[in-house]
């Protein structure tokens, strides 16, 4: 059989089939029937797409001899035969550009004319049996299924065969030929019998034991058993009149549908209390960098070497002293920790060869700051299950905080342009599928708008810090390692620049689970005097460590330089997401793309160029107490990016809850604006669900105040 396959099929198909089998750990020499089946399926997919094009009018056309002058685009994108990663990249890319629902399983083709994915089946059994197995496996209304058999039968979703008679006849003839060739060599019977059905997991697996008892206990009222409830759910039609549905449900449900009018909604209640404080893992607008241009020193790129080089650019160091203590901490320890960093950096200077990493001496101040030996001892459950008053720690309720103006300033700053570029053009990822050059064009325009944005600096800083901290946590678990906070950028003239924001010292990091915490102390340079907004810096101890000469319009002025020190912590999963912060670029690019798509579908042509180059047009950015704010397309890109970046920097359960619950209210208000006469029940419950997330988080409080501005203007 193996010889037959190699003679009968095109070498490219044979090679792809071998690769596919190796990917699943199967040997083409042993599983020869499977080898033949994969080749047949590949060939059917290629023949399905061969010669089918879409012309410049968008009409489907068949071209057998290559006419080099025709402006043609392939009608089908071939997904089968690519390696999995590449195949999913193509599928995702198609879904993003066309808005088609993403399939659960990898399909075989995408049809640009009918805008649907296609699953091709080739079976040695009855076509309808195989069709039902496929349909049952993929369970998607959207993916079109087309089955061929070796006997010339076929079956397709809704009897829609996609291709013309002749193209399908070519495939059937080829399959029939393969069958005859096999039969003449005595291979057909074994091949025919070797086909296994699509493996589908049985839907109704039995629930037994504790799970079964829990299921029976948690049934809604009036249901006697789980089966009885399942049958009801399966038969429940989700569309139609809400009141009718409610009456079908249960005697316990008595929801009255209230009309939602302009006068119905009230603003969200923001908490009272002391102003909220800064809780990001590193300083944002207040950060100060010590930088070197065109770095070319020995060991350039090794963080510790870069940091020492940056430190040497500053000459204004002075004896540090505490100017804003941390309320609860032992402040002299923070001061000693900074002095220790300076001393140990000096020690490195005196060594003959600079080491690549620096582990700090485990002094009492660092042990205190990093919470060494502070964690309660873990006891095995077996040893304490007989303790009769065993209980969880009482945790303190968080104290409510009010919205402070600093968080809006932070956001405004994040939307601004800096004078350096923080990403190269290819940072958002290369094109993988040949989906038009439109995608590249949009990406390049977008990159140009955001590459100098401060939010992009925060992304690169976040990626760097999280990567360095996760690396050190795994590589030096027991050490108090010194980690410089570094970023790289290019100046307006295109010169490379390395920046140092300060240092982190990490604590012990035996991180077994994703949520295990590693403590760290951060020490960051700044020119911001903490006494101007003391509430923002509640979690910090701030030292004055030097004087910096700044060039201003009136000449040189000397400004005190501060060091913001605090104890903080993070976990493996948080660092993993921090390393992925570049995704924020992608998320905001997709939001911009959907704006362009909407505009393009109105004008019935691609509007990318006009969108970015028509500088006179303004776009809505957001709501403020003054009304709807508008700005240039670049400003929209940067605002969307900043929102995405802040969602990452200030990620929290409060934000998750607020986003999910406020969205429901947003949709109701939008329905009212669109004159859809929405009705609601238990609106009070929805407000409660939203407001229980408004506790003390600065970013959530800011979003809630934006939401209130939106309500005011939406209901005018």
Curated annotation (Swiss-Prot):
Map motif Nuclear localization signal 1 (NLS1) onto the chain.
124-139
Task: Supply the alphabetized keyword list.
Answer: Cap snatching, Endonuclease, Eukaryotic host gene expression shutoff by virus, Eukaryotic host transcription shutoff by virus, Host cytoplasm, Host gene expression shutoff by virus, Host nucleus, Host-virus interaction, Hydrolase, Inhibition of host RNA polymerase II by virus, Manganese, Metal-binding, Nuclease, Phosphoprotein
Q: Does Endoplasmic reticulum appear among the keywords?
A: no
* Gene3D superfamilies, per the entry: Influenza RNA-dependent RNA polymerase subunit PA, endonuclease domain (3.40.91.90)
An annotated GO cellular component:
host cell cytoplasm
Residues binding Mn(2+) 2: 80, 108
Which Gene Ontology BP annotations are present? cap snatching; DNA-templated transcription; symbiont-mediated suppression of host gene expression; symbiont-mediated suppression of host mRNA transcription via inhibition of RNA polymerase II activity; viral RNA genome replication; viral translational frameshifting
Q: How is the cofactor bound?
A: Binds 2 manganese ions per subunit.
Q: How is it modified after translation?
A: Phosphorylated on serines and threonines by host kinases, including human casein kinase II.
Tell me the residue numbers annotated for binding Mn(2+) 1. 41, 108, 119-120
- Grouped into one coarse class, the protein's main location is host cell
What InterPro entries does the entry give?
A: INFV_PA (IPR037534), PA/PA-X (IPR001009), PA/PA-X_sf (IPR038372)
**Please, which domain of life does this record's source organism belong to?**
Viruses
Q: Kindly list the cysteine pairs connected by disulfide bridges.
A: none
Write the Enzyme Commission number(s) for this entry.
3.1.-.-
Q: Which GO terms describe its molecular function?
A: endonuclease activity; metal ion binding; RNA binding
What positions carry the motif Nuclear localization signal 2 (NLS2)? 184-247
* Localization: Host cytoplasm; Host nucleus
Q: What does this protein do?
A: Plays an essential role in viral RNA transcription and replication by forming the heterotrimeric polymerase complex together with PB1 and PB2 subunits. The complex transcribes viral mRNAs by using a unique mechanism called cap-snatching. It consists in the hijacking and cleavage of host capped pre-mRNAs. These short capped RNAs are then used as primers for viral mRNAs. The PB2 subunit is responsible for the binding of the 5' cap of cellular pre-mRNAs which are subsequently cleaved after 10-13 nucleotides by the PA subunit that carries the endonuclease activity.
Q: What does the similarity note say? A: Belongs to the influenza viruses PA family.
Q: Which HAMAP family match?
A: INFV_PA
Subunit structure, as described in the record: Influenza RNA polymerase is composed of three subunits: PB1, PB2 and PA. Interacts (via C-terminus) with PB1 (via N-terminus).
What is the protein name given in its UniProt record?
Polymerase acidic protein
Per the UniProt record, the source organism is Influenza A virus (strain A/Turkey/Ireland/1378/1983 H5N8)
């Amino acid at each position: 059989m193996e010889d037959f396959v190699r003679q009968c099929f095109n070498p490219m198909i044979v090679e792809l089939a071998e690769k596919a089998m190796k990917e699943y750990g199967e040997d083409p020499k042993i599983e020869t029937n499977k080898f033949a089946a994969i080749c047949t399926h590949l060939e059917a997919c290629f023949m399905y797409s061969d010669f089918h094009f879409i012309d410049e009018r968008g009409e489907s056309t068949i071209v057998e001899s290559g006419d080099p002058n025709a402006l043609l685009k392939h009608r089908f994108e071939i997904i089968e035969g690519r390696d999995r990663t590449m195949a999913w990249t193509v599928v995702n890319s198609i879904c993003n550009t066309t808005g088609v629902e993403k399939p659960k399983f990898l399909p075989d083709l995408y049809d640009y004319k009918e805008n649907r994915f296609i699953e091709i089946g080739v079976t040695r059994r009855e076509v309808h049996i195989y069709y039902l197995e496929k349909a049952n496996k993929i369970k998607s209304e959207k993916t079109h299924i087309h089955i061929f058999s070796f006997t010339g039968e076929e079956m397709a979703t809704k009897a829609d065969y996609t291709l013309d008679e002749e193209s399908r006849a070519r495939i059937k003839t080829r399959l029939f030929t393969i069958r005859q060739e096999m039969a003449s060599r005595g291979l057909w019977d074994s091949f025919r019998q070797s086909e296994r059905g699509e493996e589908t997991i049985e839907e109704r697996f039995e629930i037994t034991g504790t799970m079964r008892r829990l299921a029976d206990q948690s049934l809604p009222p009036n249901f006697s058993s789980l089966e009885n409830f399942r049958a009801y759910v399966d038969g429940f039609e989700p569309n139609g009149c809400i009141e009718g549905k409610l009456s079908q449900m249960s005697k316990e449900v008595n929801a009255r549908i209230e009309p939602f009018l302009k006068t119905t909604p009230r603003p969200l209640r923001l908490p009272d209390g002391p102003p909220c404080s800064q809780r990001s893992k590193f300083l944002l607008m207040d950060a100060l960098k010590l930088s070197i241009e065109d770095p070319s020193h020995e060991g350039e790129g090794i963080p510790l070497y870069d940091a020492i080089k940056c430190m040497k650019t500053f000459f204004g160091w002075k004896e540090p002293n505490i100017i804003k203590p941390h309320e609860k901490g032992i402040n002299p320890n923070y001061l000693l920790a900074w002095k220790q960093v300076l001393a140990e950096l000096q020690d490195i200077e005196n060594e003959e060869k600079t080491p690549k990493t620096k582990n700090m001496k485990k002094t009492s101040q660092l042990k205190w700051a990093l919470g060494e030996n502070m964690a309660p001892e873990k006891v095995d459950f077996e040893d304490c299950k007989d303790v009769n008053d065993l209980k969880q720690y009482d945790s303190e309720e968080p104290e409510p905080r009010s919205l402070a103006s600093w968080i809006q300033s932070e956001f405004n700053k994040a939307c601004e342009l800096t004078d350096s570029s923080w990403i190269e053009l290819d940072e958002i990822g290369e094109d993988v599928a040949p989906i038009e050059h439109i995608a590249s064009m949009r990406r390049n325009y977008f990159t140009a708008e955001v590459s100098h944005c401060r939010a992009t600096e925060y992304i690169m800083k976040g990626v760097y810090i999280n990567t360095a901290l996760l690396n050190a946590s795994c590589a030096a678990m027991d050490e108090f390692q010194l980690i410089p906070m570094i970023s790289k950028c290019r100046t307006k003239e295109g010169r490379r620049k390395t920046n140092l924001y300060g240092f982190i010292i990490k604590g012990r990091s035996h991180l077994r689970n994703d949520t295990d915490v590693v403590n760290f102390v951060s020490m960051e340079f700044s020119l911001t005097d903490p006494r101007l907004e003391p509430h923002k810096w509640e979690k910090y101890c701030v030292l004055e460590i030097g004087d910096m000469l700044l060039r201003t319009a009136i000449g040189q002025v000397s400004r005190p330089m501060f060091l913001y020190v605090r104890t903080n912590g993070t976990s493996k999963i948080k660092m993993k997401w921090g390393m992925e912060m570049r995704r924020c670029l992608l998320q905001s690019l997709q939001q911009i793309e959907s704006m362009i798509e909407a505009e393009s579908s109105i004008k019935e042509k691609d509007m990318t160029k006009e969108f970015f180059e028509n500088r006179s047009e303004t776009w809505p950015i957001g709501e403020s107490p003054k009304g709807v704010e508008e700005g240039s397309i670049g400003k929209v890109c940067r605002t969307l990016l900043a929102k995405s970046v802040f969602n990452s920097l200030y990620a929290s359960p409060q934000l998750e809850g607020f986003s999910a619950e406020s969205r429901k209210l947003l949709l109701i208000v939008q329905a009212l604006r669109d004159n859809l006469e929405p009705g609601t029940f238990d609106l009070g419950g929805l407000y409660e669900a939203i407001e229980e997330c408004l506790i003390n988080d600065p970013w959530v409080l800011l979003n809630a105040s934006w939401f209130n501005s939106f309500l005011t203007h939406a209901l005018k």
